[in-house]
Amino acid sequence: LAALDQTIVSTALKNIVEEFDGLNHYTWVVTAYLLTSTASTPLYGKISDIYGRRVVFQFAIVTFLLGSFLAGASQNMEQLIATRALQGVGAGGLMALTFVIIGDIVPPRERGKYQGYFGAVWGLSSVAGPLLGGFFADNETILGIAGWRWIFYINLPIGIISLIVTSAVLHIPKVKREHSIDYLGAVLMVTSVSLILLSASIYGPQYGWGDSRTIMYAVIGVILAVLFLMWEGKAKEPILPLYLFKNHTFSITSLLGAVIGAGMFGAIVMLPLYFQVVKGYSATEAGLKLIPLMLGIVSTSIVSGKMISKHGHYKRFPIM
């Protein structure tokens, strides 16, 4: 669900912004989702330690489904962005707790293999996303509802099935652990990044980089980012433990992940618009053009996961 929704929107965004006349907010439909999912991901692990894996995982599914329904019913770009942010809150739990649950039930030596399988499922969903998004976007109406709205409504039956399956088979003993949850850190992080993005992606291009609003949002965003880092150094259980960056391996892999993620998500979001507007392709054709990228993700996820489990070596794979 979470992987599908990261990519299914990309090929339909052109149709959405045309209906809502929201080209200036184009990237925010994706950014809002990624921002809230990123902020909520670290919180879910601690919350599930307190209340149990299954109930928190199911809460994440319900939150995601509610966001999906409201996104499909949106009447303007502001509503769509807000409901996509709600979807992201649910998606953060789906992404985080999947790995946590794997860690609970799979021996350490075998986790690489299962995480490889998870990566493959993630990749297949990412492949299907642009194709499904293109299919729905190219159909003006389906069952009397605008085609693009189905990119959100399709989540509902899948999510309901997931709720039924997790209720039936996910029985992990509850081991309560006391945690201090860093809500303030999450708020500071989301607010600072949001303000900086508002300055860089909306006010700067629209009103000019010297405009008072552009400068104000950028300055406040940077100040909040500094406050976030200061708070994380003092928080009992920070959302982003700064001491982790003293670990050379963690620092390098985080940097690599940021660079690769920026390029990958930039391509996933902007390439469909390029194919449709500049090249004149349909939404479905734009989705087909993304298949090579997604197939590369699928294949390397499977192979690297199995190789790490088999040999126990991991450093060579980021280099490769």
Predicted regions and their residues:
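Juxtamembrane loop-transmembrane helix junctions in multi-pass integral membrane proteins
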Residues: D21, H25, V55, Q75-E78, ...
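Cytoplasmic-side transmembrane-helix entry/capping segments in multi-pass membrane proteins
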Residues: F59, R111-L124, E178-L188, K246, ...
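Transmembrane-helix bundle of Major Facilitator Superfamily
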Residues: L1-A168
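Hydrophobic residues within membrane-embedded alpha-helical segments of Major Facilitator Superfamily
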Residues: L1, L13, T63, L70, ...
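Transmembrane core module of solute transporters
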Residues: L1-S40, G210-I220, L224-M320
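Hydrophobic transmembrane-helix bundles of small-molecule transporters
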Residues: D138-L256
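Helix-loop junctions at the membrane-solvent interface of multi-pass transporters
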Residues: L66-S74, N139-E140, S167-I172, Y203-G204, ...
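Alpha-helical transmembrane segments of polytopic integral membrane proteins
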Residues: G129, L163, S167, V193-I196, ...
